[in-house]
Amino acid sequence: MKTCRSLYFILFITLLSACEFRMAPTEYWSKLFRTQTDSIYYQGKAESLTNHIAKDIEEYEINKITVMDFVDEVNRVSILGEYLSSRIVESFTDRTLFQDRMFHVTQKGEVNEVLQQLNLKHNYLYAKNDLENLGKSLNSQAILTGKITDLGTNIDMHLTLTDVTTGEVISSATQHLTRTKFAIEMLRQY
């Protein structure tokens, strides 16, 4: 009986020594509890919107657009609006989006300077004559505006691409963002 116990003990120790014991959380748990709104998350959302709008840009043969900073429900530019518009600019300037031709996006500094000269503010909707003046001053064929709306359960980012000469909406797209404390904080700071 003692021999049998000793044999089981040795077998148990042998099996236990061959097992790996890990104190760190597995990748499954880190993915499950990972923050959903890191920069890669926003980059993916911006690329999705950009790809949708790029299809219509190809159809209209537009070579240059202006991306305005995105506004909230009361037409103010929040930190989140600035950040997301920068991500959209980044996605549009990716050379893989328009491989067969040159495509340009107006620089933000130039946009802000022209808005100041024309006595305009970042807005979601512009009057037709304001669109024409912006297009002429920025040498742009279309203006991309965006609105960020807090719906309580999530945040909607809606983009509209408008032709500066006709005032016609060329394309529009919406993306739902995860509503986190961080996103709400960025949406409420100007």
Predicted regions and their residues:
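Sec-exported extracytoplasmic/periplasmic mature domains
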Residues: A54-E58, V89-F98
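Short, solvent-exposed, polar/charged sequence segments at loop or secondary-structure edges
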Residues: Y83-V89, R101-I143, L151-G152
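Bacterial N-terminal signal peptides that target proteins for export
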Residues: M1-Y8
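Hydrophobic beta-sheet segments that form the core/acyl-binding groove
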Residues: G146
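N-terminal, charged amphipathic alpha-helical interaction modules
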Residues: E73, V77-G81
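Short beta-strand segments enriched in small/hydrophobic residues
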Residues: N63-V74
